[in-house]
Each structure stands twice: as structure tokens, then as C-alpha cells.
């Protein structure tokens, strides 16, 4: 009974879970994990630097790419502290305030990533279907307002779930099933009525997993319809190639996201290792893969990187 009393006080803590069955191999596991985090940080930082410094990529479409890189960087830095301190120092305890803060930024950046990809699909649609009006429709002011609206909407979407969760008592085991704090993981430790929290979380998940992808599919359906009406196959392939990077980024985000949701909903009794691996793929795949996708598929980003690196080498001599 004393445990219940203590866990409802302010100074509670949570216990993070490492990779089950591999506790003795933390140092070895940390090497590839650290490499992935390094790729994410360096890749997204490089893209941001190139977009900021290279005149050849000072175009409106790259403002959305810079938003995506900033979001990926935020997502990486949100999970980095708990994951690496667990693997390097076996520090599994996290205070409730730190856990709630990570919960807020983790879900906020995840929702932001989805919203930015939706905005990028609209950008592709306008560029391909209304090329003559692109500059007048997507002005710098419109893009700036879009970015501000995305931030405000994501913050306002996550805050209610944070406050709803903070008001509840935690009186079950403090053991989380992952190495960071997620809403669906924390809510199962509550010993009170969680119907409101569950319904709100379900509504948010529905919005991110169904509504955003549906709008993206609609935009690409309209793009495809427009492309099929063009004169030559060369024009069709060129238009599709311009959108290929964005399509890959969408798949990299939503396939792991759906996988995590399905695992949480329908495979609750699966091995803890499955849940940990799925969650890590979901949070690491987009920040790691997006810089690679855009640097490989986008020639202007490639040239921008080469110019940036060559200028850097000249200044260092």
C-alpha cells in the first residue's frame, strides 16, 4: 500500500528498458546505434547548412526540406540522451519531469514530421500541376505561415495529452517497455480511469496515421492524373523523379509508424524485443534515411554539398 502512496507523489520516476536479452552486449550495441545517431545529426546539419549558405538551393521548395531536417534533428536529439546513457552507463532511471518532457518533444516532433511531409506533398502538387502560378501561390510568406501553423498545431495537439496524463496517479510498476517515454507506454502504468486519455490518444493517432497519409495520397493522385495527361514519357518520368525523394520519405515515416501501432494494438503479448526494435526503427529510420534520400536523389543538394565542401577546403588551406 505504501508503494501506491509513494508513486502518486511528485517525485516519482520511471525505469527505461534496454534491449531484452542483450544486457551484456550494451557496449557493442552502442557502436551501430551511435553511428546511426551520428549519421542523423551530421546529415541533417549538413542539409541545413547547405540550404542556408548555397545560393543554388535558395528556392522555396528547399524551405520545406529545411523544416524536415530541423524536425529530424529535433527527433534525434530528443531520444539520444536516454538511449545512449542506457547503453553506455546502464542508467535506466528517469525522473517523471524528464520523462514528461521527452514525451512532449517526442510526440510533438513525430506529428511535426507528418505535417511537414503533407506540406511537401502540396508543394509537389503546385509545382507540377500549377507551375506557372507556383511563385505566386507558394510565396515565402505563405511558407513561413505554414511552418508556424505546423508548430502551433502540433504543440496544441500534444499539450492536452500531456496534461491529461500528468493529473493521473502512477501506482503500477514503473517499468517502461522502451528506452524512451511514449504515451502508449506510460498510460498502461496508470491506476485510474484512462478512457479520456485513450480516446484522445486514439483520435491523435487516427489523425496522423490516416488523415495525413490520405491527404498525401489525394495530392499524388491529382499529380498522377496531371502527369498522365502530359505529352511524352520523358516529361512523365521527369515529373515522377522530382517527387521520388518525397515519396520515399513518406514511406520511411509511415511504414514504421503503422508497424508500431499494429504491434502495440494487436501484439501486446509479443516478445519485448519486438516492441523495442519496432520503436527504435520508427524513431531512427526517418532522421537517418531522409538526409541520405535527399542527398542521393536531389542533384541540386549534391552540387550544393560539393560546393560547400570545396569552399570549406579552400578556406582551411
From Swiss-Prot:
Any one GO MF annotation of this record: olfactory receptor activity
Cytoplasmic side: 49-56, 123-141, 220-239, 297-317
Extracellular side: 1-27, 78-101, 163-198, 261-275
InterPro entries: GPCR_Rhodpsn, GPCR_Rhodpsn_7TM, Olfact_rcpt, OR51/52/56-like
A GO cellular component entry from the record: plasma membrane
Main location: membrane
Family: Belongs to the G-protein coupled receptor 1 family.
Name of the protein this chain belongs to: Olfactory receptor 51Q1
Organism: Homo sapiens (Human)
Gene: OR51Q1
